[in-house]
Amino acid sequence: MLAKRIIPCLDVRDGRVVKGINFEGLRDAGSILEQARFYNNELADELVFLDISASLESRKTTLEEVLKVSGEIFIPLTVGGGINSVERAREVFLHGADKVSVNTAAVNDPFLITRIAERYGSQAVVVAIDIKKTGEDYLVFTHSGKKPTCYEALEWAHKVQELGAGEILLTSMDRDGTKEGYDNDILAKISTSVHIPVIASGGAGNLEHLYDGFTKGHADAALAASIFHFRQHSIREAKEYLRQRGITVRI
């Protein structure tokens, strides 16, 4: 069985790590480099760096910050925010990223996924899908959760897989920052219907939530921010907890 991954996420705005609730009310969560070093030493499996306002402000991710982070860590780095072309993806890779995450740009130009995958391989392309429950459906949102799209979550997940995505980062906007646990219903629905890895995101508030994301949501990886940024739990602690409950993790 493949080991389940624990992935801290650095939501970056104006050169600092921030964290909000339901994509709103951002508060400072520390220095980018300090947090990156901490997670590297904490046995995180990967690190995600998301410039959360790049697409909203129609600008590019700051490459200097990516370069600094990549130079400080020895774990895979995924970078997202404002990546809207193959050339921009190339620049991010040249500055040390192992994977790129696309969201808004992929909805606007779905074949961007294919073009990046053809150049760098599917394993280097993560499609971030931000979803919100609307009636009985889960709709996909872009621009840091500001703009609804016409896509239903499961439909879009299948489409990005067909286009060449190597992984899906599924974030529940309803659960984001609430510490109420992942939305395991939609997580399980998508995880069991695609053949690429799905990363659970949005809502982790304790170690049991991570366990539930793997067992109830069938996620391949669990992304979290608040519980790690503010030192409520450590990644080492999380992995030991999961190991004791029968989840295969890298220690």
Swiss-Prot record:
Family that this chain belongs to: Belongs to the HisA/HisF family.
Functional description taken from the UniProt entry: IGPS catalyzes the conversion of PRFAR and glutamine to IGP, AICAR and glutamate. The HisF subunit catalyzes the cyclization activity that produces IGP and AICAR from PRFAR using the ammonia provided by the HisH subunit.
Pfam family, one: His_biosynth
Species: Pelodictyon phaeoclathratiforme (strain DSM 5477 / BU-1)
Classification lineage: Bacteria, Pseudomonadati, Chlorobiota, Chlorobiia, Chlorobiales
Pathway linked to the protein: Amino-acid biosynthesis; L-histidine biosynthesis; L-histidine from 5-phospho-alpha-D-ribose 1-diphosphate: step 5/9
EC numbers for this chain: 4.3.2.10
GO biological process, one term: L-histidine biosynthetic process
Enzyme class, broadest EC rank: lyase
SUPFAM superfamilies given in the database record: Ribulose-phoshate binding barrel (SSF51366)
Top-rank taxon, per record: Bacteria
Protein name according to UniProt: Imidazole glycerol phosphate synthase subunit HisF
GO cellular component: cytoplasm
Compartments, as annotated in UniProt: Cytoplasm
Active-site feature positions: 11, 130
Matches recorded under HAMAP family: HisF (MF_01013)
InterPro entries linked: Aldolase_TIM, His_biosynth, HisF, IGPS_HisA/HisF, RibuloseP-bd_barrel
Keywords, sorted A to Z: Amino-acid biosynthesis, Cytoplasm, Histidine biosynthesis, Lyase
Catalytic activity: 5-[(5-phospho-1-deoxy-D-ribulos-1-ylimino)methylamino]-1-(5-phospho-beta-D-ribosyl)imidazole-4-carboxamide + L-glutamine = D-erythro-1-(imidazol-4-yl)glycerol 3-phosphate + 5-amino-1-(5-phospho-beta-D-ribosyl)imidazole-4-carboxamide + L-glutamate + H(+)
Subunit field text: Heterodimer of HisH and HisF.
Molecular function GO terms recorded: imidazoleglycerol-phosphate synthase activity; lyase activity
